[in-house]
């Protein structure tokens, strides 16, 4: 998506607005463009008779797969945009992180053909359960260097103005 979609405290995609508080704190003039993504971990069924430990190991494996995927996508986007000059790919902005509300999930999914990669929004949940949706920003410089404390921010309607970490 175009850099004009990145505004003060929000992403604006056509008529849809998605609050993301950290956008109040970054230098938006550095942003070149962005990407919305969705993917899921391998969907492996565990028999009911399996031990609790086996189920735990499977969940840890799925979480590790998603972390690796997110990092691979970030690295790929940074390489892709750094052919002529150095560009940076931000960490993933997503619902529940960097001040983006969980309610952003169905909005982000609606912009993608997520079902082509097996991800869908149904009954107020992402399916499969181990799925992710989010945003990467490509920029001329490091965007989040001074916003490390924002990573776990769940967001609030008032934005960053009342944040004690600001």
Predicted features and spans:
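Cysteine-cluster motifs in flexible loop/terminal segments that predominantly coordinate metals
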Residues: 133-166
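Short, hydrophobic/π-rich interface segment
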Residues: 92-145
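Internal, well-folded beta-alpha domain core
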Residues: 52-114
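Generic structural hydrophobic/aromatic packing signal, biased to beta-strands
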Residues: 37-39, 108, 153
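Active-site helix-to-loop segments that bind/position phosphate- or nucleotide-bearing substrates
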Residues: 1-54, 58
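Intrinsically disordered, low-complexity, compositionally biased regions/tails
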Residues: 13, 18-19, 98, 122, ...
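A generic "cationic amphipathic patch" detector
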Residues: 50, 86, 163-166
């Amino acid at each position: 998506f175009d850099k004009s979609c990145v505004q003060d405290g929000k992403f604006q995609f056509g008529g849809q607005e998605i609050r993301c508080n950290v956008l109040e704190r970054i230098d938006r003039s550095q942003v070149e463009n962005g990407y919305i993504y969705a993917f899921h971990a391998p969907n492996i069924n565990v028999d009911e008779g399996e031990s609790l430990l086996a189920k735990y190991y499977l969940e840890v494996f799925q979480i590790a797969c998603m972390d690796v995927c997110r990092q691979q996508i970030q690295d790929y986007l940074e390489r892709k945009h750094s052919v002529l000059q150095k560009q940076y790919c931000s960490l993933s902005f997503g619902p529940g992180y960097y001040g983006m509300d969980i309610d952003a999930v169905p909005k982000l999914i609606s912009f993608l053909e997520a079902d082509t990669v097996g991800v869908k929004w149904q009954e107020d949940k992402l399916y499969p359960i181990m799925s992710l949706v989010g945003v990467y920003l490509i920029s001329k410089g490091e965007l989040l260097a001074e916003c490390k404390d924002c990573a776990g921010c769940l967001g609030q309607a008032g934005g960053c103005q009342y944040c004690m970490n600001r």
